[in-house]
Amino acid sequence: PSALAAGLTGRTPKYGLHLDENRLPTKRFCVKYQPKDLTDWGILGAIIGKNLGSYWEVPLIEALEVIPNSDEMKHMGAAMASYGSTPLFHLHKITPEAKNLKIEQFNNLDLIDINSSDFESLKSSFGSKGDKIDVVVFAAPQLSIVEMQKVANLSKDKSFKVPVIVCTSPQVYADSIRMGFIEKIENSGAKVLQGTCFYQQYAREIGEANGWKKLLSNSTKIVNILGGYGYTPALATMENCILSAVKGEIV
């Protein structure tokens, strides 16, 4: 309702994160294990979100050795919001409001270290090598054109034993048709959907109708959500999701 009202009036409430004082960091996180792929970035977001668990908490994330690209930041932010209802984060010396932040002014905040063991603990709670799978889903967040290209290249000359569902936006879908990505993906037996996301389209009913229980994805956000829709979700990198779809089990 508030978003609709803002669209109609051109105004938003002077409230929450629209106020500068509410955008300041409330907790610090020191990243001591550097994410290596999209799944790792999602796991990082999940770890931070679980430690926050509140709309009003704003994390300041420190010690990243690389600047994440848009897809990496997308997966991190999506997982952070899924696990912690966290709408805003700062990456020290990277994101606009944190480029000139002086760490010293936040020395009074709790500082939480994030280690490789934290990554492994979360990852191991979602499936194990050799587990049979019923469906592979790439969604939540919807795939960018870069991700579509990667799925297309990984799917080339493959034949999937289980259904593979890929969700993207209408614009990226149109671009992917023009660039030949959709053809490559669907030639392997996968299905590309546009303008939707898997968990928003009666995911429970789809699973029950098809007998799907074990779902594999590279999205830390979606495996968190779909546990509440009757699935037993598992997590793997995009590459291993594709290989698992070929084999019918987690590789």
Please tell me what each predicted stretch does.
Residues 1-251:
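Non-transmembrane, aqueous-exposed alpha-helical and coiled segments at domain scale
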